[in-house]
């Protein structure tokens, strides 16, 4: 309704400024005579109907254009500078270019005299022509509000600073203005303000400029003054009441900021505390239901993160944008996706560089253990069983043997007696190279042995040295005569070792663990299998460093998204917090599992998870601080939407797409994704009601805009 009033207001304002409305209607309708009973219908028809340029002759149009009185929609002569927008309805107010009707924009351009801004002298001239002399600067002599103060209230300003200078003058004003009517004229007489020959807001406030949006804001005020026939005299007490209302709204905003910090802190704390959940689920990791629960949680995270990105973050980032602004916000979303891709791969490259440096500084081991990974894609491809292999983890594989402290020293003891080992029952290195073995997989083991022994293949295996102190001295003495260069494997439960005649007492306890992993890809009815060597993490410090960097990056961006969402409105903040919570649950479980399987204690794993959670609070502070600006908040929403889309579709979607062997698993994953999308959809649809429930100051304006 307000939009239509503004459209008519601009037309009437132009009519009063240029010529009488009756003459204007006659000029629009050409030679047709306008009668009293149908003038209103013809005016409405002209306002809401675009007449064809052929309704007037070419000579008449050119004559009117030359005289400067061309008030028709003669786009064939001077087309409007603004073209129609393909998108509308993205602004939370009636002043957006995408919501301004074409007729309003056309007359605004004529009022602005083809300039983008109207200066103070031009506005005073407009007030004089409208017979609103009391609003003209210097004409009120302190009895009425001057036009400069009126402009100050419709333009963005520091309310607290202005109110500090005005409240003393307002306190001297009495609410006993009288209306004096003399025939057809009316004047309002109010008590005079102290005349100090100085504008209450300063001399600089007398010189101002008006944009087309400012003029739209002033139109209802000017139209009301024309209707009241008061000569444009606005009581100062009215502005005093308006200032009081604005002050109350500012106080409500300050109160909302307090709750924004509280809710954001609670949300980030709830997401960060999920690192402790890993301690509680340790007894249930071996349960048959664990992998199904993880699959549902990962699918739920995919639904919530994509839903929050597409149903909440992106719509808010595009609100009130013109076509160019929408394109730039979409570019920001793409930038978030590319940024996260570059950062993840940069961390991987740095990790590989660190391991290569450590490998060069470490001597080659004298013993090596070669084993087949029981969790390789050939043996097991269920995502629930590979939860520690998700892309969030610092290392993509689990190393069970590292944590088997009770078996770390046993694998070095040869399963055969000394005579058997010395007598040649065990295959030699040469036999392994030739592919001789008594079990399947010896060729793979031989290749690994070759890579360990040959200096040309030292870059194929990364070394992990362990120094073991054996408690049984007699047992060590029995094996003291064994060869110091031994390769052992547990492929399919069998043990294979290679003997070298060189003996080195000092290096007999140095060894390296090598993991053989077979990968299989199936498509079009056939499959391909290949195997290569993986190594466990070099040191626990490398694992901890990668966890802090990778997980810390996720937590910082999550905290920033939560802070910016709460700064925009509390309901949207809870929507983003729920999406982050659903994403963090399987994420933290995966990080906790990789730390435990890398040999860390439970206490250390919890410490590292909580340490990375601190970055969430830092991101939250950045989000709330910069989210106070609407423009900055929209950019943050666009980038956060890109980050959420990348995490959901690149990091988490492969975890569930790789495990849909059974119909039950497929239905469970679909249920999780639909649940996440449904939750985000409900929050997006009823966001205004949620804002009202939390009592935010912007709830009323938000609901009014929609």
Curated annotation (Swiss-Prot):
Q: In which tissues is it expressed?
A: Maternal foi has almost completely disappeared by embryonic stage 3 except in the pole cells. In stage 6 embryos, expression is enriched in the invaginating mesoderm. In stage 9 embryos, high levels in the anterior and posterior midgut primordia. In stage 14 embryos, broad expression with low levels in the epidermis.
Note the effect listed for residue 554 to A: Severely reduced zinc transport activity in yeast assay
- Signal peptide start and end residues: 1-21
Give me the Cytoplasmic side stretches, as residue ranges.
283-292, 351-604, 653-665
- Main localization of the protein? membrane
The protein's topology relative to the membrane is:
Multi-pass membrane protein
Enumerate the UniProt keywords alphabetically.
Cell membrane, Developmental protein, Differentiation, Glycoprotein, Ion transport, Membrane, Neurogenesis, Phosphoprotein, Signal, Transmembrane, Transmembrane helix, Transport, Zinc, Zinc transport
Query: Where are the annotated glycans?
Result: 74, 119, 176, 182, 196, 207
Where would you find the membrane-spanning parts of this chain?
262-282, 293-313, 330-350, 605-625, 632-652, 666-686
Q: Which residues lie on this side of the membrane: Extracellular?
A: 22-261, 314-329, 626-631, 687-706
Q: Where is the composition biased (Polar residues)?
A: 40-56
A cellular component term, taken from the record's GO annotations: plasma membrane
Changes after translation: Glycosylated.
Sequence segments annotated as region (Disordered): 40-101
GO BP: any one term: intracellular monoatomic cation homeostasis
Q: Name one GO molecular function term.
A: monoatomic cation:bicarbonate symporter activity
The subcellular localization recorded is: Cell membrane
List the protein's name: Zinc transporter foi
């Amino acid at each position: 309704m307000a939009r239509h009033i503004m459209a008519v207001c601009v037309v009437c304002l132009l009519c009063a400024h240029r010529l009488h409305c009756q003459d204007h209607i006659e000029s629009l309708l050409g030679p047709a005579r306008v009668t009293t009973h149908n003038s209103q219908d013809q005016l409405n028809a002209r306002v809401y109907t675009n007449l064809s340029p052929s309704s007037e002759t070419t000579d008449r149009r050119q004559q009117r254009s030359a005289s400067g009185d061309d008030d028709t929609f003669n786009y064939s002569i001077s087309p409007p500078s603004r073209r129609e927008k393909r998108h509308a309805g993205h602004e939370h107010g009636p002043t957006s270019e995408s919501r301004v009707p074409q007729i309003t924009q056309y007359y605004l351009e004529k009022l602005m005299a083809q300039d983008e801004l109207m200066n103070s002298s031009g506005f005073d001239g407009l007030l004089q022509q409208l017979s609103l002399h009391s609003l003209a600067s210097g004409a009120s002599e302190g009895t009425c509000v001057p036009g400069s103060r009126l402009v100050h209230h419709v333009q963005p300003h520091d309310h607290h600073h202005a109110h500090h200078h005005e409240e003393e003058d307002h306190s001297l004003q009495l609410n006993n203005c009288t209306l004096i009517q003399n025939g057809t004229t009316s004047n309002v007489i109010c008590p005079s303000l102290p005349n100090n020959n100085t504008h209450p807001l300063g001399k600089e406030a007398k010189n101002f400029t008006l944009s087309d949006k400012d003029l739209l804001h002033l139109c209802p005020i000017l139209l009301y003054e024309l209707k009241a026939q008061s000569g444009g005299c606005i009581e100062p007490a009215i502005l005093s009441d308006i200032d009081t209302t604005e002050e109350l709204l500012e106080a409500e905003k300050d109160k909302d900021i307090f709750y924004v910090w509280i809710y954001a802190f609670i949300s980030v704390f709830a997401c960060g505390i999920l690192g402790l959940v890993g301690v509680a689920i340790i007894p249930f990791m071996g349960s048959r239901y664990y992998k199904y629960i993880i699959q549902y949680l990962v699918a739920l995270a995919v639904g919530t993160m994509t839903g929050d990105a597409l149903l909440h973050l992106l719509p808010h980032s595009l609100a009130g944008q013109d076509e160019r602004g929408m394109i730039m916000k979409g570019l920001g979303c793409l930038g978030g996706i590319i940024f996260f891709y570059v950062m993840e791969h940069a961390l991987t490259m740095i990790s590989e560089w660190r391991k290569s440096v450590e490998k060069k500084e470490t001597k080659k081991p004298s013993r090596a253990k070669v084993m087949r990974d029981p969790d390789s894609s050939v043996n097991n491809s269920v995502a629930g069983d590979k939860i520690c292999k998700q892309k969030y983890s610092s290392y993509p594989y689990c190393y069970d043997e590292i944590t088997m402290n009770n078996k770390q020293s046993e694998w070095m003891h040869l399963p055969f007696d000394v005579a058997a080992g010395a007598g040649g029952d065990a295959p030699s290195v040469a036999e392994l190279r030739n592919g001789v073995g008594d079990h399947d997989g010896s060729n793979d083991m031989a290749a690994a042995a070759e890579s360990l022994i040959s200096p040309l293949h030292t870059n194929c295996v990364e070394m992990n040295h362990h120094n073991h102190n054996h408690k049984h001295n007699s047992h060590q003495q029995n094996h003291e005569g064994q060869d110091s260069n031994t390769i052992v494997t547990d492929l399919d439960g069998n043990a294979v070792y290679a003997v070298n005649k060189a003996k080195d007492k000092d290096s007999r306890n140095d060894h390296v663990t090598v993991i053989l992993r077979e990968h299989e890809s199936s498509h079009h009815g056939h499959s391909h299998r290949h195997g290569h060597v993986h190594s466990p993490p070099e040191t626990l410090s490398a694992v901890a460093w990668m966890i802090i960097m990778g997980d810390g990056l996720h937590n910082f961006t999550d905290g920033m998204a939560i802070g910016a969402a709460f700064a925009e409105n509390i309901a949207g903040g809870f929507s983003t917090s729920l999406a982050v919570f659903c994403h963090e649950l399987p994420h933290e479980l995966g990080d906790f599992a990789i730390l435990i399987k890398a040999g860390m204690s439970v206490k250390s794993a919890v410490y590292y998870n909580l340490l990375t959670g601190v970055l969430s609070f830092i991101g939250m502070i950045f989000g709330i601080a910069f989210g106070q600006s609407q423009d900055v908040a929209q950019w943050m929403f666009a980038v956060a939407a890109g980050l959420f889309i990348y995490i959901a579709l690149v990091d988490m979607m492969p975890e569930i797409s790789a495990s849909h062997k059974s119909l039950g698993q497929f239905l469970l994953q679909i249920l999780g994704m639909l649940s996440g999308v449904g939750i985000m959809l409900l929050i997006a649809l009823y966001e205004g009601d949620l804002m009202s429930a939390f009592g935010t100051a912007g709830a009323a304006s938000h609901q009014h805009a929609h």
